[in-house]
Structures are given as C-alpha cells and as structure tokens.
Amino acid sequence: MSLEILKKYKIRAKKSLWQNFLVNDDIVEEISSIVDIEWKDIIEVWPWYWALTEKLVEKKPKSLNLVELDNDMIEILNSRIKNNDFTIENIDFNINNIDVLKYEPESIGYSIIANIPYYITSPILRHFLYEVGNKPKDMVILMQKDVWDKILWKWKWKSWVLSLFIEKKCNVSEALFVAKENFVPAPKIESSVLLFELHDVYNDINDELFLDLIKKAFREPRKKLIKNLVNSWYNKELIINIFNELSIDEWVRWEDLDIATWCQLSTIINK
C-alpha cells in the first residue's frame, strides 16, 4: 500500500527536507500500535506522505493534529481525503502548516508520533520536553539509530548532554529497529523507533538552572568537573563544600554522575 501511494501520487523525496519514506506496511502498523490511540489526543509530526496518518485514523483517536511544513505533502493529503483513501469522520482532524519548533499544542496529556531527520532531533526534543506549555504524555519517534546510540551509550560528551536533558524529563526505550531497506530512498544509516515516557520525578528542579549547569559543566569536556565549574565563575570553596555535602569526590569526572546527582547539584549550587 505504501509504495502504491508513492506511485499513485507521484511522490518524490526532497533532499532539502531530508525525506526518506518508510514503505514497509507492517512496520507502519507496528509504529501506530506502540501507544494507545483510541479516543486519545494525537499529534503527528512530519507525516510526509500520510501512510502512518491513515493507520492512526483507523484507530479512532479523539483528535489528530498534523504538523507538516511541506505544502506539496499537504496538497497530497487533501487529494487522498477527497479521493476517499481514508475517512476522517468523527475525529477532530487538523493540519498545521507550521514549523514544528513554533508549534504550541493546545491539548493536555497528548501523544506525539514523529519521524525526525538527524539534523533537527535535539531541537525537537528540547521543544516538546522543555519549551511548550503543555507537555506530552509520551512520544513515539522514528530517528536514525546513531542518535539512539548516543542517548543510550553516551559515547561522547555531546551525547551526555543530550542524554541528561532527556533523562530529566522521561524514560526512553527502543520500541522497534527499522532497517534502512524499509525506506525509499534508503538512507545510509539504520533507524530506531524510540518510546519516550514522560515522568515528573525531577519536575521540582528548575529547568533553566539545570540546563545552565549542564552547559557549564561540559564546556571543556577534557577537564575535571570541578575545574569547569570554577572556570564558570563558581567559587571553588563553595563547590568543594557542595561536593562534600553530596558525597561527590573532588576530582570526579562529569560522566561519573547520574541524573539524580546532577539534579541535586543543580538545586544546591543555585541556592
């Protein structure tokens, strides 16, 4: 069905938008089944050629808000609806022709389903985890597997920064591996579908102060944590006292601290 849609509507991937179309119908079905859809508020980000949209509609959500910047794709969607490829009856169905980083969800406790290109992964995660007023309940995101590896394995300092700002807000697990052969055109890298389940464990920790601490702590990743903090205009004696209070070794490296300790450090250091 997915390949038929591409052929019927003469859809071509745009390199400028980093488009790779998932054409394995079984995987599309699996993605649509990761979280509960029926009578829920769903936001689909960058639907592109609407194969997943069709599956979501079949599961009868309460509302389905699509966020798509590509005008050509929106025109194709309208054609598919006009041709009765699928019906949107009894669904609060909206198309938002807007940059996703400017999109502000109105509903509460919604789920996000998204297909995110590599270059905008971090900005989109930050937008929905930190910037929007109404946060999602969970997010199902198809992304390049090397991004998932960075979040999971933290093999470079930039990966630690990404992982920490995610861990503060949610638990992450790999829901599905997607081989590159399932896309048209096939990308160079395999993909994964990740499930982000938001929690409120650290909601009492100020987001702005936490992110500021992380930025300062990782400003020179080859240095010890204490040196980075002192070089960021924190008083050395204050830092040592805080480390002692939290039972942190004075010469600890940033990769040795877990998210709970980072949150404690953020709270105390900014008193």
Model-derived regions: residue spans:
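Catalytic cores of RNA-modifying enzymes
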Residues: 1-212, 216, 244, 255, ...
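C-terminal lobe and adjacent flexible extensions of AdoMet/dcAdoMet transferase-like proteins
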Residues: 198, 216-271
